[in-house]
Amino acid sequence: FERSAGIREIGAGVQISPNAGRLLHSLGLGAAYSEISVNPHRVVLRRWEDDSIIRATDLDESFISQHQVPLANVARNELVEIIGNAVAARTNVTLKFSTHVVAVEPGESSSVVLFSDGSSQTFDIVIGADGIHSVVRPCVGGIDKPRFSGSAAYRALVPRSAVEDLPVDVTNRMGPDR
């Protein structure tokens, strides 16, 4: 169930850990996923004041051998398109758009999902991937309201052609108290 009217391009870049990369490969999406991903050579944490390195992790052949797939960066819209196309190709999956889940009533052997139009459906399992204002989270003990942590992250996507000569590193600059 998706609240929006269709698959939308929201967000910028997504960093895919080896665990998630292995999952994409196991779902048969490895070739398409590999085409859109950029594999950084290392992850570097730097001090914001002087750009000195706090820590660097090489993502070399040893890392890939240990984890079976590399760490990868992808454009979110391209990843969503690959997954959306794979789901749409399945005959045993139905995507329902413009469907607003307002509550979930957990039960012993099934749960009832309530929708904004007053309808409901019963399921053996409910998986919530419904974001920061989750309707599903309170059903599994996540009762804390979201709050600002005081931290912010900024990302940008730059055309590959504009940065081809730069090292492919993930760099984090750590500011005060972080």
PLM regions: where:
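A conserved short coil-to-beta-strand element within the FAD-binding core of flavoproteins
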Residues: 97-111
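Glycine-rich FAD pyrophosphate-binding loop
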Residues: 1-12
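Short, conserved active-site loop motifs that form the nucleotide-linked donor/cofactor pocket
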Residues: 93-94
